[in-house]
A protein has these predicted regions:
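Function-critical acidic carboxylates
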Residues: 1-117
Length: 117
């Protein structure tokens, strides 16, 4: 089965007030061997403590701190996420005052994706 790119959810926003988490709706495609990829970048003045989709914890795939740019980036993945419309929730380790950019993309046909490295 071929890997098929499904729904995408882009998000960029300056917090209207300090955030301790970010919640954004995303629709996971219906199909076998689903996968959800979420990436976000934010100021490195705060960290993050996790990411969930539909209440299921996602696996941290990669994180990077760009000290010179004063930004931190992370990406999370979830094999066989619940289909349909659910919330992505990114939890922060403290209040976030700076803009946060997030991008989520759904896949089907991800059989053989294996373990995150």
């Amino acid at each position: 089965m071929a890997l098929i790119i499904g729904n995408k959810t882009p998000f960029v926003q300056q917090p209207p007030s300090p955030w301790t988490s970010l919640t954004k709706a995303h629709t996971q495609n219906t199909g076998s061997d689903g996968f959800l990829f979420v990436s976000f970048i934010m100021s490195n003045s705060r960290g993050y403590s996790g990411c969930t989709y539909g209440g299921q914890p996602m696996t941290l795939i990669k994180t990077q701190n760009f000290g010179g740019l004063q930004q931190r980036w992370a990406c999370y993945g979830l094999l066989n996420p619940p289909t349909g419309n659910n919330n992505i929730v990114v939890s922060f380790s403290g209040s976030v005052f700076s803009p946060v950019s997030m991008f989520a993309v759904s896949f089907t046909g991800s059989s053989g994706a294996g373990v995150f490295a």
